[in-house]
């Protein structure tokens, strides 16, 4: 079973809004109490929250579906439905949120940072909110809107001050184990490290974090080996350290060629966090070189031979041994000085404020196009939303939808394009046979609650008929 997961695809779905209520106030000595149906509650949203106690995306590996609660339905006596609770999903510090097209949506850094991944649907209006001078007691209410559904990719980019890069078996894990309290797996074969290891290093009264990245090979920036999976973990590192195995016996390998090969991979890698005002490009990050395994005599001679050539590049060079722990203290304090100087020269990250994006109210635009089969397709945010809010089992609700489309100008546009009565018109997921209701801007004839004269339906059971049916049932029971 994997214990460290740094990339997952999750399916988020916000809660739907509650339906509105169609109710009439009933009270003694008040025969005309009027409508009192409450509005539906807002659906809950899916919110990502950075939790410093979470260090992996393992939970999403087994439970990739995240669903928030829906809002409650409105009730009579002007009682609005309860809003659905927001679902707060805890993610590690350094999580990057990408959409299904790979576009960066959020970079979650810092404890408590929040990001609304999926917005909850709005609740439907009750008949009390729909009452007007022409429609004093609506016999219908609007349905709640569905919550937003999104497929998102979460990538964990380790937050560390120093990143150790090098070829397999260079001694990176051993170095982390001796300068910090971390205990990564160490063995004498390549690719022992399969997941990044973090360690906290104490430098006098200060401390900094070190990330041990799994070994890189030529072509890592194009996906060879585990390169693309773990190169992203060094994107946030302030200092990059080349760890070189000076005791390698492989033909064609030497410290200079190893460092040049690693630099070529770092230059070819395209990080996700491009354009970050706080981070430089990887090519501009401070570098240091650790020539490891100088406890071997031949390795010490080779390290001393290339030390001056590497120093000419302007990089600090440290000759160390993780076995004898030689020169570890100069390395620790040297890295701390590089980290502090880099952070002091960079602009401080501005406090991340929650971004409020109100739902636009000026969404009156729509478009009508012929579908090539004698019908028409109406597109637009407002008509499509109205379709989802309409209860098509209620005649008055359908008539109310027709009134809204008339006022918006949809029927006028259909007539202009040559639409004939009975042709198929598609709005959203609904296709119906279009019948002109009334000229655009004209007066709409109104009828009793729950009915619409334009639909010419007379199968609705009225209050008098229900009362007569109850009387007949009582008479049969008495007999």
Curated annotation (Swiss-Prot):
GTP binds at residues 166-173, 191-195, 212-215, 292-295, 321-323. SUPFAM superfamilies: Obg GTP-binding protein C-terminal domain, Obg GTP-binding protein N-terminal domain, P-loop containing nucleoside triphosphate hydrolases. Mg(2+) binds at residues 173, 193. Residues 358-436 form the OCT domain. One of its GO terms (cellular component) is cytoplasm. Residues 438-479 are annotated as: Disordered. One of its GO terms (biological process) is ribosome biogenesis. Its cofactor is Mg(2+). Residues 451-467 have a biased composition (Basic and acidic residues). PROSITE patterns: G_OBG (PS51710), GTP1_OBG (PS00905), OBG (PS51883), OCT (PS51881). An essential GTPase which binds GTP, GDP and possibly (p)ppGpp with moderate affinity, with high nucleotide exchange rates and a fairly low GTP hydrolysis rate. Plays a role in control of the cell cycle, stress response, ribosome biogenesis and in those bacteria that undergo differentiation, in morphogenesis control. Belongs to the TRAFAC class OBG-HflX-like GTPase superfamily. OBG GTPase family. Residues 160-340 form the OBG-type G domain. Monomer. InterPro entries: G_OBG, GTP-bd, GTP-bd_Obg/CgtA, GTP-bd_prot_GTP1/OBG_C_sf, GTP1-OBG_CS, GTP1_OBG_dom, GTP1_OBG_dom_sf, OBG_GTPase. Residues 2-159 form the Obg domain. Pfam families: DUF1967, GTP1_OBG, MMR_HSR1. This is GTPase Obg. Its EC number is 3.6.5.-. One of its GO terms (molecular function) is GTP binding. CDD domains: Obg. The keyword Zinc does not apply. It comes from the Bacteria. It is found in: Cytoplasm.
């Amino acid at each position: 079973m994997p214990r460290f997961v740094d990339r997952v695809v999750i399916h988020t779905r916000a809660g739907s809004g509650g339906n509105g209520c169609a109710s009439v106030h009933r009270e003694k000595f008040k025969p005309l109490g009027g409508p009192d149906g409450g509005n539906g509650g807002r659906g809950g949203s899916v919110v990502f929250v950075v939790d410093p106690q979470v260090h992996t995306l393992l939970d999403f590996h087994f439970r990739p579906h995240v669903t928030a609660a829906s809002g409650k339905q409105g009730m009579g006596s002007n009682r609005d439905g309860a809003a659905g609770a927001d679902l707060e999903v805890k993610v590690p510090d350094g999580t990057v949120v990408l959409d299904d097209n790979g576009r960066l949506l959020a970079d979650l850094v810092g404890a408590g940072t929040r990001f609304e991944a999926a917005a909850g649907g709005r609740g439907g209006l009750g008949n009390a909110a729909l009452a007007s001078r022409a429609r004093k007691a609506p016999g219908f209410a609007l349905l709640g809107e569905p919550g937003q559904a999104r497929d998102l990719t979460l990538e964990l980019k380790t937050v560390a001050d120093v990143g150790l890069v090098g070829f397999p078996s260079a001694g990176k894990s051993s170095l982390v184990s001796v300068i910090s309290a971390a205990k990564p797996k160490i063995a004498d074969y390549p690719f022992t490290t399969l997941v990044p290891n973090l360690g906290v290093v104490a430098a006098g009264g200060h401390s900094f974090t070190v990330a041990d990245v799994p070994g890189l090979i030529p072509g890592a920036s194009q996906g060879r080996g585990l390169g693309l999976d773990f190169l992203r973990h060094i994107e946030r590192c302030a200092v990059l350290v080349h760890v070189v195995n000076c005791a390698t016996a492989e033909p064609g390998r030497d410290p200079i060629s190893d460092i040049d090969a690693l630099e070529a991979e770092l230059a070819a890698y395209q990080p996700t966090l491009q354009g970050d005002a706080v981070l430089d490009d990887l090519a501009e990050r401070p570098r240091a070189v650790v020539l490891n395994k100088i406890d071997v005599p031949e390795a010490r001679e080779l390290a001393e031979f290339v030390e001056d050539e590497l120093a000419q590049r302007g990089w600090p060079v440290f000759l160390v041994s993780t076995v004898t722990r030689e020169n570890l203290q100069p390395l620790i304090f040297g890295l701390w000085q590089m980290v502090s100087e880099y952070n002091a020269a960079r602009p401080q990250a501005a406090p991340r404020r929650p971004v409020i994006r109100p739902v636009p109210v000026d969404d009156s635009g729509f478009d009508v196009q012929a579908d090539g089969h004698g019908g028409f397709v109406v597109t637009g945010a407002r008509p499509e939303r109205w379709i989802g809010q309409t209860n098509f089992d209620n005649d008055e609700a359908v008539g109310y939808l027709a009134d809204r489309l008339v006022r918006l100008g949809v029927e006028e546009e259909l007539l202009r394009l040559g639409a004939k009565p009975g042709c198929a018109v598609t709005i959203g997921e609904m296709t119906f046979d279009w019948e002109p209701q009334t000229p655009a801007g004209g007066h709409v004839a109104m009828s009793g609650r729950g009915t619409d004269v334009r639909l010419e339906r007379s199968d609705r059971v009225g209050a008098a008929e229900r009362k007569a049916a109850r009387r007949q049932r009582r008479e049969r029971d008495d007999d």
